[in-house]
Amino acid sequence: MPIQCHDNPDADAIASGFGLYCFFRDQGKDVRLLYAGKNRVRKANLTLMVEKLGIPLKYLAHPGEEPVDGLLITVDCQFGAGNVTKIRASEIAVIDHHPLEVICTEKMRLQPNLGSCATLVWTMLQEMHYPVENNKNLGTALYYGLFMDTNQFSELSNPADMDERAGLD
């Protein structure tokens, strides 16, 4: 099951994808975390995040060559929007905190009132009783995703964002 971050992923996209990756991996699913687009991740903070937290993020240079048989989950983006390379898949799910851009599937969870997609994924993991606190690297990634997408917490306003920060602090 591939989980796709938007092209040129930021800390929030990587953290959110990693949260879903850990959940599905621990459920025994064969899961991959990937992204496509023109550029590989090169920013120092992101390469360190991926390396130090053991995030298995893979770059697809030729995404059209590997169609997905089954479900593709896009995270921190919406399939068909301008910031994500389309990977052919028989089924699409979208998890995002941005306003609706494209209606591409019935399997969408959008919460544009949140400061980060990491908050949305953290909330979903809490709903599933997934023990984020048992995975220090995942907790760190989700915390950093929220930190970066809320301008170092200066734009925290939603109670769910505040709950995530407190829960991972």
Predicted regions and their residues:
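A structured phosphate/pyrophosphate-recognition subdomain
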Residues: 1-8, 16-25, 103-169
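Active-site cofactor/cluster-binding pocket
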Residues: 51-107
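Short secondary-structure boundary/hinge segments and terminal tails
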Residues: 41-42, 67-69, 143, 163
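Generic detector of well-ordered alpha-helical packing
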Residues: 11-13, 77, 97, 150
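Short, well-ordered secondary-structure micro-motifs
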Residues: 44-45, 85, 105, 156
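Anionic-ligand anchoring segments at beta-strand to alpha-helix junctions in alpha/beta enzyme folds, i.e.
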Residues: 1-65
